[in-house]
């Protein structure tokens, strides 16, 4: 009986304490006499300040975006480096190919020179030339320092210079014969024109090979081909020929 009364009293007290006016939320009894544990308080404070707020989310997004930007820039930098290395490798390959081609060309030239050397040695041996005991010096000159027309040291001593070979010998004019007319006399009455010494005539250009011969011919004869001959050189008739006495040939022993 007492138990039933005690339960009824607790139920009445509990209903009155936990009752709430209509329209309001259900009020729960406070825990631990209305005191909150310190651990729960710290957890709540740390949880709120840990990033559930708007500023924390923005900062984290900014950090992630900055990290993604750094990764993109690094990838672009690496891509440019790889492209530059690829171009450099291709250039080196081309240079190596050119060097290899030049090496093969030099090898062919060397083989040909060796064949010529062996041939010359056989020829000299057949003539009995003692070329192995002779001493000579080979002068190596840089390419482009002198032209291909420059004479070698051996030719400079044995052969005359090129200018001396091309220049014609100077000839002294022979004295005119007593019977020949003067240059200004004769039926034509024209003066002889001297041919210039540079090997040129009017309207005719001579090559260096033919110039010395042409100068020599014109200086020897001393007249032009289209000039009229003097009357003393014209052929006479048979009645104007001078008679020559016939001489008997001496008797042979």
Swiss-Prot record:
<feature type="modified residue" description="Phosphoserine">
    <location>
        <position position="249"/>
    </location>
</feature>
<dbReference type="GO" id="GO:0043065">
    <property type="term" value="P:positive regulation of apoptotic process"/>
</dbReference>
<dbReference type="GO" id="GO:0045995">
    <property type="term" value="P:regulation of embryonic development"/>
</dbReference>
<keyword id="KW-0805">Transcription regulation</keyword>
<dbReference type="GO" id="GO:0006310">
    <property type="term" value="P:DNA recombination"/>
</dbReference>
<feature type="region of interest" description="Disordered">
    <location>
        <begin position="234"/>
        <end position="253"/>
    </location>
</feature>
<keyword id="KW-0804">Transcription</keyword>
<comment type="subunit">
    <text>Interacts with NOL3; translocates NOL3 into the nucleus and negatively regulated TFPT-induced cell death. Component of the chromatin remodeling INO80 complex; specifically part of a complex module associated with the N-terminus of INO80.</text>
</comment>
<dbReference type="GO" id="GO:0033044">
    <property type="term" value="P:regulation of chromosome organization"/>
</dbReference>
<dbReference type="GO" id="GO:0003677">
    <property type="term" value="F:DNA binding"/>
</dbReference>
<feature type="cross-link" description="Glycyl lysine isopeptide (Lys-Gly) (interchain with G-Cter in SUMO2)">
    <location>
        <position position="216"/>
    </location>
</feature>
<feature type="modified residue" description="Phosphothreonine">
    <location>
        <position position="207"/>
    </location>
</feature>
<keyword id="KW-0227">DNA damage</keyword>
<dbReference type="GO" id="GO:0097190">
    <property type="term" value="P:apoptotic signaling pathway"/>
</dbReference>
<feature type="modified residue" description="Phosphoserine">
    <location>
        <position position="188"/>
    </location>
</feature>
<dbReference type="GO" id="GO:0006338">
    <property type="term" value="P:chromatin remodeling"/>
</dbReference>
<feature type="modified residue" description="Phosphoserine">
    <location>
        <position position="167"/>
    </location>
</feature>
<dbReference type="InterPro" id="IPR056513">
    <property type="entry name" value="INO80F"/>
</dbReference>
<feature type="compositionally biased region" description="Pro residues">
    <location>
        <begin position="170"/>
        <end position="181"/>
    </location>
</feature>
<dbReference type="GO" id="GO:0000723">
    <property type="term" value="P:telomere maintenance"/>
</dbReference>
<dbReference type="GO" id="GO:0005737">
    <property type="term" value="C:cytoplasm"/>
</dbReference>
<keyword id="KW-0233">DNA recombination</keyword>
<dbReference type="GO" id="GO:0045739">
    <property type="term" value="P:positive regulation of DNA repair"/>
</dbReference>
<feature type="region of interest" description="Disordered">
    <location>
        <begin position="142"/>
        <end position="211"/>
    </location>
</feature>
<feature type="modified residue" description="Phosphoserine">
    <location>
        <position position="180"/>
    </location>
</feature>
<keyword id="KW-0539">Nucleus</keyword>
<dbReference type="GO" id="GO:0031011">
    <property type="term" value="C:Ino80 complex"/>
</dbReference>
<keyword id="KW-0234">DNA repair</keyword>
<dbReference type="GO" id="GO:0005654">
    <property type="term" value="C:nucleoplasm"/>
</dbReference>
<keyword id="KW-0053">Apoptosis</keyword>
<protein>
    <recommendedName>
        <fullName>TCF3 fusion partner</fullName>
    </recommendedName>
</protein>
<keyword id="KW-1017">Isopeptide bond</keyword>
<dbReference type="GO" id="GO:0006275">
    <property type="term" value="P:regulation of DNA replication"/>
</dbReference>
<dbReference type="GO" id="GO:0005634">
    <property type="term" value="C:nucleus"/>
</dbReference>
<keyword id="KW-0656">Proto-oncogene</keyword>
<dbReference type="GO" id="GO:0051726">
    <property type="term" value="P:regulation of cell cycle"/>
</dbReference>
<comment type="function">
    <text>Putative regulatory component of the chromatin remodeling INO80 complex which is involved in transcriptional regulation, DNA replication and probably DNA repair.</text>
</comment>
<keyword id="KW-0160">Chromosomal rearrangement</keyword>
<dbReference type="InterPro" id="IPR033555">
    <property type="entry name" value="TFPT"/>
</dbReference>
<dbReference type="GO" id="GO:0006281">
    <property type="term" value="P:DNA repair"/>
</dbReference>
<feature type="region of interest" description="Disordered">
    <location>
        <begin position="49"/>
        <end position="72"/>
    </location>
</feature>
<dbReference type="GO" id="GO:0006282">
    <property type="term" value="P:regulation of DNA repair"/>
</dbReference>
């Amino acid at each position: 009986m007492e138990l039933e009364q005690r339960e009824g009293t607790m139920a009445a007290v509990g209903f009155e304490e936990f009752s709430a006016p209509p329209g309001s939320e259900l009020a729960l009894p406070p825990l631990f006499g209305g005191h909150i544990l310190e651990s729960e308080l710290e957890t709540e404070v740390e949880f709120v300040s840990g990033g559930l707020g708007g500023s924390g989310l923005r900062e984290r997004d900014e950090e992630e975006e900055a990290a993604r930007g750094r990764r993109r820039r690094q990838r672009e930098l690496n891509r440019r480096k790889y492209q530059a290395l690829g171009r450099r490798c291709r250039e080196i390959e081309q240079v190596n190919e050119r060097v290899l081609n030049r090496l093969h060309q030099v090898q062919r030239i060397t083989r040909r020179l060796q064949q010529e050397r062996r041939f010359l040695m056989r020829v000299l041996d057949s003539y009995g030339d003692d070329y192995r005991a002779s001493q000579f010096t080979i002068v190596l000159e840089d390419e482009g320092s002198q032209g291909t027309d420059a004479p070698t040291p051996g030719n400079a001593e044995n052969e005359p210079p090129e200018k001396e070979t091309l220049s014609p010998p100077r000839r002294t004019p022979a004295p005119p014969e007593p019977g020949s007319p003067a240059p200004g006399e004769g039926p034509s009455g024209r003066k002889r024109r001297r041919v210039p010494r540079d090997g040129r005539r009017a309207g005719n250009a001579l090559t260096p090979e033919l110039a010395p011969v042409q100068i020599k011919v014109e200086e020897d004869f001393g007249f032009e081909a289209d000039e009229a001959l003097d009357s003393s050189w014209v052929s006479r008739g048979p009645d104007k020929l001078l008679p020559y006495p016939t001489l008997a040939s001496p008797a042979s022993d």
